[in-house]
């Protein structure tokens, strides 16, 4: 090494190269520092060269005494890791009066860097103020106090090398030098914090005499060898580096430290050694951290980065690869930074970890997202593979929850196995759980709804059959039977649903409004059935009017009270209409609101009146036909028996002639046999009526146009009798018919009556205006409000 600070007080530009070439940069903290100060031309460079094998420039005696070392020079010991600083001598002629300022700066620099400060002085100068460099010593003491103020440093070792020593009693020289040092210390104004301190609290003074190099060469060489051992032989009790010094900085940061230190000293700023050390530590730690991060980024680029056009895939060895790379990066940083301030090293290490974490975290999140996507994919596959219906004894929810738990454990394990040490990353896997939970709840709701719909659909089949049977009968218990059926089927549906839900899902039960579903469905069935209300009324009328109670077709005779039968049959048909007038599905425990469908009007008043009119027009034909049959029978019964006998006798020849023909004879036997059998069974009247109906139907088909015209006329006019009624005066009968017509010309029950209160009753006539039962008259066109029939 050569000059590091010029005589003008400027740092050389190639300081880094010089420190590196000396080998100190690679020494870490395993090196020592020694600085030497003293008067100009006192042999400072010479003694360093002799002690450490360096090649500092020395004075050329042929040119006389002059300034040889300008500024500060540095060199490494040839055989030992000791960095030497050769400081420009004081009291030089060249500097003159400006010497004091540079002397102070160089002394402060030497004390700040060196573990041992060597003061080279002549024995002959001891005891003289200027000659013994008392001002220089005073400067050393003052700047050392300044260092102590800035840091709690170790004592400064000051080695006085007494040149050209001739004293027999060296102790006397030491005493005299100590006296001078004490006097200097007493003149120094100590800070308040150091009041009462002795100079021994700040300095460790050592003394070593060296004989004259020319006159006493052998002794001089022996003295140099002895002094060298103080620097390079640790076992020696006088070894100067026995104690660990706080002044040594890591070799790789020494150049930066020197640069910062001299900048502060040269600008006369307050020197803060700990601050400078911290600055150096931060600088080097930043430098090492940047290099470690660069190496790590290279690893990421080579192993983790993927082509943007390629799909992201799971990296199987993600954690081992990253663990190893992170470990290498941190190891590189620690190996190159551990010599600096521990606090700074740890602080920057934490920052480096965060920087590495910031680089790795996106890759970690990407891997975790793939795990989550794979988990959801497996979950969806499982949901699709299981039965899509709930069954008795099934365990749908527990099976799904078990799968979710298993997938969640796998996901957490994958995330944990992907987390790189020493980072504590957390991936929000709860989002996956939320998605699976929502999907499960949605699927559960769908299956429960599907189950209810399936069970209700199955129940509806039998319900429709039973409900239609009830609606077809249209009796007084129709609404009671419908309510009982609804109650029964809704209870069964609820029980069946809960039986399936009990083992499949928890906390879910059948809907409370299942009964309402059946009620609503029943209303639709009733409305559908009400579309055929006229047909139902006609069928009910026919069952009563045209058939006996035992189900046989009615054969009308003069003994039948046709008017009463007609009235009863007509009332039965009208009762069907009343049953369908309004809905009666509400029960006592049902919550019925205003305008509730369970109590709604099914057939409005105006519509009911129209239906009744149509019903009246339809059933009148059956009444007229029955009257015609009775009249025909009456006419037949008026022919006397002798007339039939006379007719038979007059026709006997013709009859015998017919019977002589085998064909007619066979027909007569067959017809006679059939008639005898029917008579024995009591079915002759039924057979007669059937034949007459067939005959009449045939006639109607043959005279279709005429019948249609007659039908239109009958709808607009009252039917007239074609034959006089037997056993009654024709004139009296017409007067009675006129009276009956006037009495029953009122509107029908649904035209004249109003719905009252709950609509439970309507009025119909209670007595027949017809007189004698044996005198059949035309049926009443309408009913008077004299009879009350309760609604069911």
Curated annotation (Swiss-Prot):
Domain of life: Eukaryota
Compartments where found: Endoplasmic reticulum membrane
Keywords: Coiled coil, Endoplasmic reticulum, GTP-binding, Hydrolase, Membrane, Nucleotide-binding, Transmembrane, Transmembrane helix
Regions of compositional bias (Acidic residues) in chain numbering: 707-723
Function: Probable GTP-binding protein that may be involved in cell development.
Alphabetized HAMAP family for the sequence: Sey1
Protein name: Protein SEY1 homolog 2
Origin species: Trichomonas vaginalis (strain ATCC PRA-98 / G3)
Top-level taxonomy: Eukaryota, Metamonada, Parabasalia, Trichomonadida, Trichomonadidae
